Amino acid sequence: MLNIYLSGEIHTDWREEIINLCKNDNLNISFSSPITNHEASDNCGVEILGKEEKKFWKDSKGANINSIKTRKAIKDADIVIVKFGEKYKQWNAAFDAGFAAALNKSIIVIHNDEHQHALKEVDAAASAVAKDQYQVVRILKYILEGSLN
């Protein structure tokens, strides 16, 4: 069984697409991901540990709590898939890719051609750079089954 961490943008259903496509192909994969509820992710620190007057400390508390899950999941992953969306700059996704690279994890990056130049260093650390979820699932199927179908 492969353990895969799904990092990246949280504004589309790309994770569910990959999970469902892999299920349809009966691929033996376990998936994990960050907290994708944006409001909960942003506010967990102050909701759990108390309010902050300055936004920096609010964000710091939330990021620190969220990093507990992220670090564990990336360390446990065989492959880290990082999706960069079209609308927002996903700094945390780039950080996850760097952390995964530092741990010598296999990385698959997803982004459109428009972001190629901005992500060239991230792409250089990746084992594969895909344009969409379908290409990712084909990679996973090939890795697990040796099949190109």
Each language-model region and where it sits:
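Conserved catalytic or regulatory cores that recognize and/or transform ribose-phosphate-containing ligands
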Residues: M1-N149
